[in-house]
């Protein structure tokens, strides 16, 4: 059964019967009536409350079978009810997803992207949530006090994420020197084809898992080759993988990205630090462009007027917060693909990040990795992430490389780094310029 057919069947099963529609969404007509009763007083209001209570009781009466503990990510529809999407099914929409009533969503203030563990029983539509056990690992009552992500105060990244792991892994050592990453960074890896971006992403994820065990690592793969998805799942068993391969529909690409970002937001609200890798924001923008085209006006490269609105919003979710956690997003942007659309996407998004790691195809063609253009790579406000003495010595290195061609600069940088067991030891050996 295709994803599209499954999704349509779910929507039909939730709305085709009038009795079902009244139970799930209280009916279009009764919703309007209840809205009027809320505004008024007297008998109308009590009648509306009585009707709602009767419908809530109907849910309980129709349940049968033993209570079973299940869990998944909550996805709320525009009509107020929701479903738990299961990790084992790659968060796809299926007919046996756990149904969450509008009353439970309202009473507990549930939001998209929450990881919910609950007791369920069989209802006439399938499994239905009957009792919340925990929300994002917390007691359901504690969750009610959580702030909203949009209300959190965003500040500059000021806590560095150390990426260096071993002496011979030059990828992460070079990033620590040239484009350091902090908690809440919004970074772009600007990558031509076959320049080593997938390897860099994998090394970054492994570094965070090894060096920062308290940080939740998430990987979002959009319109990716199926074998790449399988390889990353195998290589990163401790990361949460959200993937849509290129044999899936466009709507699935958009949907899985929104689920992943909402999941990350809910973790930040709970005070956790999240590190997300996104591959790629270019393909995500293409997906939203195709999903929302519908014959509307197009601009340069075939992009519709509002095609980049949602990708920009998702990428902009990366931030360091003052009173809660942080969301770091490192996304890849594809360039030199002979596509006017890809070039336009990069031009529109490059100003939204605060860190860039630029890969160079001419360096990669010489089999020099990581194929980084040192002069075009860097982090804004890196002085907030580095101790003053390290920042000064890294500035000395950059000045020493100035005037070289990019391929000469990376060769010289790597040859120096190979002589020392760590970056710290290398920086100690550099004499300050007084």
Locations of regions flagged by a protein language model:
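P-loop NTP-binding catalytic core
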Residues: 122-189
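Short, structured beta-strand/loop micro-motifs enriched in basic residues and often containing a Trp
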Residues: 93-102, 165-171
């Amino acid at each position: 059964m295709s994803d599209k057919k499954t999704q349509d069947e779910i929507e039909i099963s939730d709305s085709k019967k009038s009795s079902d529609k009244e139970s799930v969404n209280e009916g279009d007509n009764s919703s309007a009536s209840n809205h009027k009763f809320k505004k008024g007083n007297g008998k109308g209001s009590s009648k509306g409350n009585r009707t709602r209570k009767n419908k809530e009781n109907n849910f309980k009466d129709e349940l049968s079978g033993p209570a079973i503990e299940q869990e998944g990510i909550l996805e709320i529809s525009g009509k107020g009810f929701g479903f738990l999407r299961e990790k084992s099914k790659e968060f796809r929409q299926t007919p046996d997803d756990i149904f969450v009533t509008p009353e439970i969503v309202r009473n507990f203030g549930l939001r998209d992207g929450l990881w919910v563990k609950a007791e369920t029983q069989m209802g006439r539509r399938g499994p239905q949530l009957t009792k919340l056990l925990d929300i994002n690992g917390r007691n359901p009552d504690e969750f009610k006090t959580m702030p909203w992500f949009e209300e959190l105060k965003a500040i500059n990244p000021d806590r560095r994420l150390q990426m260096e792991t071993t002496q011979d892994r030059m990828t992460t050592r070079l990033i620590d020197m040239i484009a350091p990453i902090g908690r809440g960074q919004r970074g772009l890896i600007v990558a031509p084809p076959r320049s080593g971006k997938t390897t860099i992403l994998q090394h970054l994820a492994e570094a965070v898992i090894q060096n920062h065990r308290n940080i939740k690592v998430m990987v979002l793969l959009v319109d990716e080759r199926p074998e790449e998805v399988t390889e990353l799942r195998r290589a990163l068993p401790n990361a949460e993988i959200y993937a849509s391969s290129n044999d899936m529909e466009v709507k699935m690409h958009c949907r899985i990205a929104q689920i992943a970002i909402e999941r990350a937001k809910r973790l930040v609200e709970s005070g956790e630090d999240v590190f997300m890798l996104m591959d790629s924001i270019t393909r995500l923008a293409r997906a939203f462009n195709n999903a929302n085209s519908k014959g509307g006006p197009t601009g340069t490269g075939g992009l519709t007027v509002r095609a980049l609105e949602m990708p920009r919003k998702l990428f902009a979710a990366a931030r360091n917060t003052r009173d809660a956690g942080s969301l770091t997003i490192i996304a890849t942007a594809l360039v030199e693909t002979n596509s006017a659309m890809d070039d336009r996407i990069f031009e529109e998004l490059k100003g939204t990040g605060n860190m860039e790691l630029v890969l160079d195809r001419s360096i990669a063609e010489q089999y020099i990795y990581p194929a980084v253009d040192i002069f075009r790579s860097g982090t804004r406000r890196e002085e907030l992430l580095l101790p003053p003495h390290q920042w000064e010595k890294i500035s000395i290195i950059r000045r020493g490389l100035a005037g070289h061609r990019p391929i000469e600069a990376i060769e010289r940088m790597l040859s120096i780094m190979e002589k020392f067991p760590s970056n710290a030891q290398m920086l100690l050996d550099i004499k300050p310029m007084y």
